[in-house]
Amino acid sequence: MQQIDDTRLDALMGRLVGEFGALASAPLVILGDRLGLYKAMAGAGPMSADRLSAKTGLRVRYAREWLNAQAASGFVDYDPVEETYALSPEGGLVLGEPDSPAFMIGGYEVLSAMFQDLDKVQKAFVDGTGLGWHEHNACLFSGTERFFRAGYNANLEPSWIPALDGMAERLRAGARVADVGCGFGASTIVLAKAYPASTFVGYDYHEPSIAAARERAREAGVADRVSFEVAGAKTYPGRGFDLVAFFDCLHDMGDPVGAAKHVRQTLADDGSWMIVEPFANDRVEDNLNPVGRIYYSASTMVCTPCSLSQEVGLALGA
């Protein structure tokens, strides 16, 4: 038997206790979002459990226990003298304001899907098969949209589009844009709001997502210049697009090379292909950090199985 280093053992066990706490608190974050608890606290200053209960209509005993868990997690500040709880302005941006560029609740919905789909991914591991995007729990779809929408709101018009030479001017004048792998249409709608003279079509093979995207476009008031169609990355119709965009989806595709060839066929001669992907280093050792940990985990549960379920199955992963 190998000799055990007690110091290292204690450190690992201590770290896992912290992991247990993080995992146990995750459902409470989702509850805080679903029940409007964070929104009720955002900008309201210190409040007691009774006041939060009155604002939300929830039973005070539940409100108090939830607040104590939030304080233990460091998400809210607790005043032991006044017995009040406060969500900081920063906490409001991260937890209570869906349109904030720092909003992160969507990521918790993605984590929820990962747990709910555990048996399916386990089967794929054993069988060596894949798990299609459409086979996941529905909270993956909504969570992905909510998580990435914050970044699209913050970056698409101010920095990403201007990074393509002359593209902002073309979009302002009126261009044809295809958004491939659009999901619920967050990126498409952000672009349509920013460039009302252009026309946009979002493509996704997942029919429920396309239905949701159409409804979102109507709600946003951009349905006059935005349409959504069910189509894959290698089969979407249309020619002569001034811009084809792939936002956070290329690495999930089974045949990204085939998708790239199709993009070339559908672009105008002077068109541009815009690819936005989460940043990762090329070497494993350079990704052994908190962000890399999230990427490798999400890739194991979602991205790699998704690619392996498709033709070619290149499985780029994280």
Regions found by a protein language model. Name each.
Residues 7, 14-40, 64-175:
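Conserved Class I S-adenosyl-L-methionine-dependent methyltransferase catalytic core
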Residues 41-45, 192:
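Short helix-to-turn junction characteristic of helix-turn-helix DNA-binding domains
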Residues 44, 72-73, 270:
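Alpha-helix C-caps/helix-loop-beta hinges
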Residues 46-54:
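Short acidic, hydrophobic short linear motifs in intrinsically disordered regions
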Residues 113-251, 256-258, 274:
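Conserved adenosyl
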Residues 257-269:
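A short glycine-rich, Lys/Arg-flanked "PGG" loop and its adjoining helix->strand segment in the class I
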Residues 276-318:
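C-terminal alpha-helical "lid/dimerization" subdomain adjacent to the S-adenosyl-L-methionine
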